[in-house]
Each structure stands twice: as structure tokens, then as C-alpha cells.
Amino acid sequence: MTSLTKVVAAVAGCSAIVNGAVIPAENGLHTTTLQTRDTAKGTGHILSKREPVTIAILTAAGTAAVTAIVNEAVSAAAAFIGDISNFDAGREAFTVQTTETMMANNPDPERFQAAACYNKAFSVADPANIDGQSSVEFRLGILNTDYECMYIAAPNQFFTEGDGGLINLSFTHTDRCTFDQETADLTCV
């Protein structure tokens, strides 16, 4: 049993290291989150009904070209997620997939240093340096929530006014941005 205890401790340690980590990609972009969801509770072999994720763009503001790219990223994320049975897992996949797709299709890499999706209250230092902001409804069966997804141009700061975690927040950004683990805020220079 001692070896099993060591394996469990090692896995838990690795999990703690990953939580709140910056995940580097081969293209030099980083997806940053503040993961707070309890991953120790597994569903085991529970069978459940799988349902398709539906996404609706509620409102959009910004230049037409940039807003179109945000909307395409949102649609691609919904297609990528497909049919799922867990609302929280779907939300986590949605936030990460959307911001990564947005940055992979960045219309102006010199200007836009980050993509964000967040479903809590937020503010920014310079609203003029936000583009493509879209209000998105994420729905699975009777459960739903909404997100704001947008590009962040530098210089700017994105201030979170709620909790983080992949379920609520994802930033994909260049090295010109830094993520504050304590506040879950992003600063781009």
C-alpha cells in the first residue's frame, strides 16, 4: 500500500503544480487560467445522457472583421466540444478552445496580445484597446451561462471582478502579457 500512497501523492502534487499554471504552446502563446475546480471527485463509471452544446452570439461590438473572427472561434469551439454530459467540463473546454482559436487566427498580431473569455464582471484600463467583444450564451440542455469573449490590444489591463478557474476564465496571450495569480488579472504592455 505504500507504493499506492506514493503514486497518489505524486499525482496530487502534479495536479497542484498544474493548477493556475501558464500552459505554453509551440507557437509561443500561453493559455492562462486559475483552476479552482475540485478534480479529486471523479464520476467513475457513471453512465449519463450526452447532449450537444449550443452556442449563441447574443451581442457583438467592435470592428466587423475582428468580431467575425471571434464569432468563428466560438462556433469552432462548440463544434470541437460536440456532445458532452458534463456542463462544467464543457464550459472549461469552451473557454480554452475559444481563446486558443482566436489567437491562432489573430487578425493583427502586432496589436492584439491576448484573447479572453470570462463570465463574471470585469473592467479594463483602456476600453478603446478591446475589440471584437461578443456576448456568448453557452447552453447544455437546460443549463446555460454567458461569456464575454474579446481581443485585448496592448497596452491594457483586464481586471477580473469574480472568481477564475477554467470554468469562468481563459486568457491566451503572448509574452507581452503577464497573469497575476493572486488577482487573476492580465496586464499587456
Model features per residue range: what roles?
Residues 11, 18, 26, 40-42, ...:
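Intrinsically disordered, low-complexity segments enriched in small/polar residues
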Residues 1, 26, 31, 44, ...:
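Generic N-terminal initiation segments characterized by hydrophobic and/or small/turn-forming residues
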